[in-house]
């Protein structure tokens, strides 16, 4: 036997409108309200359901007005046990999440419930903010061009990240997006010293648990808030979890005037959840089955991730590329909003080179002399030229063999192979798997090393010496060891 109750009290004790559920189809719930008390779009609604296992409160978000006093809402939790005729109450506002210093070190779901409170522990947040907010006014925006040094050679040299910018990590399944984003959390949170917010959007629960354990072990969790809506959650939760995390980040930026790091893994799942919700609401699909509002939804999220005067949100977003197809509307729509792209390539990971960054496809808007300096730009351009020439020659090598190349091209191929291997690097996030300690290489050392390699100073070093090493000192040590053995 199931009994259901609903109170008539809204937030702050005000009288809330109550309605009645008239239809339930999976996560889609239709409710009828009095004509003069219709809830607004995006308002949160609550319904209390008592099951044999105890009572639970479902949160619904109004998505459509159907006419005839009916609203259609998307549930943020499974609707098991919800039946027609149950009373539902309008809270009078959109979903809100806790904000402030008390959220650091805690894990939340999309509706702001804390998931890792100890027995007897309570959370006293500074405030609650609505997750649907306007982007900062144009007059308040402040473009940033300062480089965010990561200590990862391939990124710092060829696709440098922007402080206060939006960075995309593109790649298909299993090429290392989550490992790289975990690596960036460890590196940047340690060196950056600011506040971090992590949004787990539609990814594996195991990865979420691993991330919490790693952050606790490395000591960065006390400066981080985590918001999870994993792949076993309803589409409504996966669609809103990024907004919930972004709202927490905006509070640190706008009220506490802090520099904030926002990590989103995975932005494709945000798009995917939007597609599911769009289908559930009966909208006509657009290209490749995506929602017709894809560009609008992506823009609403990305336009809020920005720099305002004095402080910024720096965002790293993992972006799954379906079937490695970069023309798919989901990754293609995201490209336009990014300041830097790091493309992870399966053919590079197949060679055992990690991080498996494609040096020719990755890009950054600040890789220009006026932003990174003339020497950095010149070295990066020369490295790309050598790698591009090697790529152009690969068909000839495959058919005729390397012996048929000119002496100049043979030299180029040798240097390209050394550069390709030197772009690999041991990471802190993979230490437990590889047993090899991660390395951080300052940008000046990175530029100096690649300048010497591209000019031929290390042509006599064996190629294997360049593989998975840190800076110049590490390279020279490995080369001496290998030459002594040989």
UniProtKB/Swiss-Prot annotation:
It holds the Pfam family ATP-synt_VA_C. InterPro entries: AAA+_ATPase, ATP-synt_VA_C, ATP_synth_F1_bsu, ATPase_a/bsu_AS, ATPase_alpha/beta_chains, ATPase_F1/V1/A1_a/bsu_N, ATPase_F1/V1/A1_a/bsu_N_sf, ATPase_F1/V1/A1_a/bsu_nucl-bd. It is a peripheral membrane protein. GO terms for molecular function: ATP binding; ATP hydrolysis activity; proton-transporting ATP synthase activity, rotational mechanism. ATP binds at residues 171-178. Keywords: ATP synthesis, ATP-binding, Cell membrane, CF(1), Hydrogen ion transport, Ion transport, Membrane, Nucleotide-binding, Translocase, Transport. It is found in: Cell membrane. SMART domains: AAA. GO terms for cellular component: plasma membrane; proton-transporting ATP synthase complex. It catalyses: ATP + H2O + 4 H(+)(in) = ADP + phosphate + 5 H(+)(out). Its EC number is 7.1.2.2. Produces ATP from ADP in the presence of a proton gradient across the membrane. The catalytic sites are hosted primarily by the beta subunits. Belongs to the ATPase alpha/beta chains family. F-type ATPases have 2 components, CF(1) - the catalytic core - and CF(0) - the membrane proton channel. CF(1) has five subunits: alpha(3), beta(3), gamma(1), delta(1), epsilon(1). CF(0) has three main subunits: a(1), b(2) and c(9-12). The alpha and beta chains form an alternating ring which encloses part of the gamma chain. CF(1) is attached to CF(0) by a central stalk formed by the gamma and epsilon chains, while a peripheral stalk is formed by the delta and b chains. This is ATP synthase subunit beta. It comes from Salinispora tropica (strain ATCC BAA-916 / DSM 44818 / JCM 13857 / NBRC 105044 / CNB-440).
């Amino acid at each position: 036997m199931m009994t259901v109750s609903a109170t008539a009290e809204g937030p702050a004790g005000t009288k809330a409108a109550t309605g009645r559920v008239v239809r339930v189809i999976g996560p889609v719930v239709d409710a009828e309200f009095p004509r003069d008390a219709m809830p607004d779009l995006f308002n949160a609604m609550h319904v209390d359901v008592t099951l044999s296992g105890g009572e639970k409160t479902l949160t619904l978000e109004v998505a459509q007005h159907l006419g005839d006093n009916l609203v259609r809402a998307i549930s943020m939790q499974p609707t098991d046990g919800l039946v027609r005729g149950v009373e539902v109450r309008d809270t009078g506002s959109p979903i809100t999440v806790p904000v402030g210093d008390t959220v650091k070190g805690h894990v939340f779901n999309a509706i702001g419930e804390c998931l890792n409170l100890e027995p007897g522990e309570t959370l006293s947040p500074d405030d609650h903010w609505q997750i649907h907010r306007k982007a900062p006014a144009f007059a308040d925006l402040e473009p940033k061009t300062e480089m965010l040094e990561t200590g990862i050679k391939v990124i710092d040299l060829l696709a440098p990240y922007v402080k206060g910018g939006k960075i995309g990590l593109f790649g298909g399944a299993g090429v290392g997006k989550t490992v790289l984003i975990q690596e960036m959390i460890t590196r940047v949170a340690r060196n950056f010293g600011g506040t971090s917010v992590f949004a787990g959007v539609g990814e594996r629960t195991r990865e979420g648990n691993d991330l919490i354990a790693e952050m606790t072990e490395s000591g960065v969790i006390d400066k981080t808030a985590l918001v999870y809506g994993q792949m076993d959650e309803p589409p409504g939760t996966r669609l809103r979890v990024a907004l919930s995390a972004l709202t927490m980040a905006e509070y640190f930026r706008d009220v506490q005037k802090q520099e904030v790091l926002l990590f989103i893994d995975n932005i494709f799942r945000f798009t995917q959840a939007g597609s599911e919700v769009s289908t559930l609401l009966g909208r006509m699909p657009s290209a490749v089955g995506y929602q017709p509002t894809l560009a609008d939804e992506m823009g609403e999220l990305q336009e809020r991730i920005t720099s305002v005067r004095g402080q910024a949100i720096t965002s790293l977003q993992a972006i799954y590329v379906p079937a490695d197809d970069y023309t798919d509307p989901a990754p293609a729509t995201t490209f336009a909003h990014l300041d830097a792209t790091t493309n992870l390539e399966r053919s590079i990971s197949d060679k055992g080179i990690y991080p498996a960054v494609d040096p020719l496809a990755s890009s950054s808007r600040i890789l220009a002399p006026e932003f990174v300096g003339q020497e950095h730009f010149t070295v990066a351009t020369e490295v790309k030229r050598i790698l591009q020439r090697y790529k152009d020659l690969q068909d000839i090598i495959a058919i005729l063999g390397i012996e048929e190349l000119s002496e100049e091209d043979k030299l180029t191929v040798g240097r390209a192979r050394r550069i390709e291997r030197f772009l690999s690097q041991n990471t802190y996030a993979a230490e437990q798997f590889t047993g090899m300690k991660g390395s951080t290489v300052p940008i000046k050392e990175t530029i100096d090393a690649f300048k010497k390699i591209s000019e031929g100073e290390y042509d006599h070093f064996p190629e294997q010496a360049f593989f998975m090493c840190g800076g110049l000192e590490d390279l020279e040590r490995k080369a001496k060891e290998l030459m002594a053995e040989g």
